[in-house]
């Protein structure tokens, strides 16, 4: 009898827990994805803050030349970063208990791998939580689909690229200057500016900014005034009102005359789908581009593609970019190897008699 009562109480507790986790009445929705999201993001955030402030220098290139990244070791907010895990570790899973000591773990950049893996798991669960809440509220699933673009981008630079290059030391450092360093080195080694998927990403981000500004300014300029001239037009809106808050016909007419008729949407739903889909598709392509360049399927190479009748090279902008790439490659990891890979791969020229 006692065992039956205990089982019933246990079942009731589990049932109440499930109801609380999946309740849409909570101030913040938790959800089953949230059960995993909360501890992983808290872990990533906590370790990031501690390491950004106090982590000792990291031997990123595996050549016994540690690089300082934390505030207490001479950096500021701009130059500081979480230094990627050492090339000596490569792609090995490197939790604290795999190192001989905490000092060794810190020296080899263990915090970077810990932060990145927890962060990626956390943001993936955040995306799942968006879908879960949409499902419980009877909404369509496109919020999570849109969020998949930045999730894909983060996964590309923090996980796919290191896998393709063979080491977490090639991942993007977690800091402002570190991000710029990653971008410069990426251009030097992969010529990303000449990759069509990066071009699509630029069109997506800049185009999305343009379309967002156009839409916002058109709506703001065609509000249906519900207030006097002495009051803000924004005060005329009541949350949850059924009436349209702006005149889409007026906005359509204005924009159609400004450019041409069919450049303007006459369907609000199609318009907002376009506003969401354009930047999302662009960022998807960029993430795909990073993921292909991770395995050295690089940007277009038009070097020395124009020659005169005598076979002499006529430089184009592609050759100027190539010269800049070589310069950037020479500067980075200057003590890890004698020559950048492009120069080292060239066959030696015989100078004998």
Curated annotation (Swiss-Prot):
Gene Ontology BP term (one): photosynthetic electron transport in photosystem II
Residue numbers binding chlorophyll a ChlzD1: 118
SUPFAM superfamilies: Bacterial photosystem II reaction centre, L and M subunits
Residues noted as binding a quinone in the record, renumbered to the chain: 215, 264-265
Binding site for Fe cation: 215, 272
Record note on quaternary structure: PSII is composed of 1 copy each of membrane proteins PsbA, PsbB, PsbC, PsbD, PsbE, PsbF, PsbH, PsbI, PsbJ, PsbK, PsbL, PsbM, PsbT, PsbX, PsbY, PsbZ, Psb30/Ycf12, at least 3 peripheral proteins of the oxygen-evolving complex and a large number of cofactors. It forms dimeric complexes.
Function: Photosystem II (PSII) is a light-driven water:plastoquinone oxidoreductase that uses light energy to abstract electrons from H(2)O, generating O(2) and a proton gradient subsequently used for ATP formation. It consists of a core antenna complex that captures photons, and an electron transfer chain that converts photonic excitation into a charge separation. The D1/D2 (PsbA/PsbD) reaction center heterodimer binds P680, the primary electron donor of PSII as well as several subsequent electron acceptors.
Protein's name in the database: Photosystem II protein D1
Species classification: Eukaryota, Viridiplantae, Streptophyta, Embryophyta, Tracheophyta
Encoding gene per record: psbA
């Amino acid at each position: 009898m006692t065992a039956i009562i205990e089982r019933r109480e246990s079942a009731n507790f589990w049932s109440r827990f499930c109801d609380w986790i999946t309740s849409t009445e909570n101030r913040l929705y938790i959800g089953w994805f949230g059960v995993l999201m909360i501890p992983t993001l808290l872990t990533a955030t906590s370790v990031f803050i501690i390491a950004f402030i106090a982590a000792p220098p990291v031997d990123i290139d595996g050549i016994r030349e540690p690089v300082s990244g934390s505030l207490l070791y001479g950096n500021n907010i701009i130059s500081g970063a979480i230094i990627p895990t050492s090339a000596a570790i490569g792609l090995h899973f490197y939790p604290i208990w795999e190192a001989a000591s905490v000092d060794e773990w810190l020296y080899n950049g263990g915090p970077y791998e810990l932060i990145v893996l927890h962060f990626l798991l956390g943001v993936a669960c955040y995306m799942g939580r968006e879908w879960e809440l949409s499902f419980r509220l009877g909404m369509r699933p496109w919020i999570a689909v849109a969020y998949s673009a930045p999730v894909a981008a983060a996964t590309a630079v923090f996980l796919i690229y290191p896998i393709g290059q063979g080491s977490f030391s090639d991942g993007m450092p977690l800091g402002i200057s570190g991000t710029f360093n990653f971008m410069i080195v990426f251009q030097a080694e992969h010529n990303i500016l000449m990759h069509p998927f990066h071009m699509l990403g630029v069109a997506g981000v800049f185009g999305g900014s343009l379309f967002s500004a156009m839409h916002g300014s058109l709506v703001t300029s065609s509000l249906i005034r519900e207030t006097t001239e002495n009051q803000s037009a924004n005060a005329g809106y009541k949350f949850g009102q059924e009436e349209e808050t702006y005149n889409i016909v007026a906005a359509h007419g204005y924009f159609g005359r400004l450019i041409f008729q069919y450049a303007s949407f006459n369907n609000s739903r199609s318009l907002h789908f376009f506003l969401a889909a354009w930047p999302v598709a662009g960022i998807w392509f960029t993430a795909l581009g990073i993921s292909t360049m991770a395995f050295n399927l690089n940007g277009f190479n038009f070097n020395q593609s124009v020659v005169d009748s005598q076979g002499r090279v006529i430089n184009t902008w592609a050759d100027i970019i190539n010269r800049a790439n070589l310069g950037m490659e020479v500067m980075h990891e200057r003590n890890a190897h004698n020559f950048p890979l492009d120069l080292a791969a060239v066959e030696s020229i015989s100078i004998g008699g």
